[in-house]
């Protein structure tokens, strides 16, 4: 009794296949999943979580793993054998099963409790698939996960290009930028390391920077950091989160 329409697209120059999906869902006691079987052997699968990822077994040899129907993921889940990798991306579907190289994303369910009609309506969502050569750290999966969730905005009237900041690294992510709560006009940047690596990076701020500090969650200054030619120099541990306060000239 359900129907769906799906546009499958592969953009020029991209390695990501997107599945833009609309489903008119009218089911009971049903679960809809999409399966991507692969021939990759990876002992552990990778599931994104906030500010990083967690590795979980791709097998069910232990009792608690056999009872685990699916696990949580955010923007992506991936399997990699060291030389090749495959990832499933999504914009709003957070349950996934992983076993023997297969990634199975849960799209819809039709439970009876507490509301038998809870999901009986039209659903619109997008998921994607991407493959690459090399290790997970060499891939652009994190970037593609952001692209499928935060598409660029098109604004009329602006002809020049401008980037507020650039990390100069494929594994340091600027998660948020805001004005300081104290009304000083300072900028607050939230950054994190996304690929379980240790590195030093120079975050280029394309505004006149006077000084920069590491700060706490309440935006209180804790430690001044070096600024060279408008670039803020910082060291990151694996999955480290940093909040930086930028004072402009």
Give the residues covered by each predicted segment.
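C-terminal (or distal) subdomains of carbohydrate-active enzymes
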Residues: 1-249
């Amino acid at each position: 009794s359900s129907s769906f329409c799906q546009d499958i697209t592969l953009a020029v120059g991209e390695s990501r296949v997107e599945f833009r999906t609309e489903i008119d869902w009218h089911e009971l006691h049903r679960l809809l999943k999409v399966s991507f079987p692969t021939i990759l052997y990876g002992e552990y699968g990778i599931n994104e979580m906030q500010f990083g990822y967690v590795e979980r077994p791709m097998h069910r040899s232990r009792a608690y793993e056999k009872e685990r129907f699916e696990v949580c993921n955010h923007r992506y889940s991936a399997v990699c054998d060291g030389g090749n990798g495959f990832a499933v991306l999504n914009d709003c579907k957070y349950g996934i099963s992983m076993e023997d190289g297969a990634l199975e994303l849960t799209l819809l369910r039709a439970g009876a409790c507490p509301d038998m009609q809870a999901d009986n309506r039209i659903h619109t969502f997008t998921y994607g698939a991407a493959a690459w050569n090399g290790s997970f750290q060499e891939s652009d999966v994190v970037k593609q996960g952001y692209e499928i969730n935060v598409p660029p905005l098109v604004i009329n009237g602006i002809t020049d290009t401008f980037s507020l900041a650039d990390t100069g690294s494929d594994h340091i992510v600027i998660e948020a930028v805001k004005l300081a709560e104290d009304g000083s006009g300072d900028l607050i940047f939230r950054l994190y390391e996304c690929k379980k690596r240790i590195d030093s990076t120079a975050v280029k701020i394309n505004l006149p920077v006077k000084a920069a500090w590491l700060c706490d969650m309440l935006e209180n200054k804790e430690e001044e950091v070096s600024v060279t030619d408008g670039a803020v120099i910082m060291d990151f541990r694996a999955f480290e989160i940093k909040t930086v306060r930028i004072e402009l000239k």
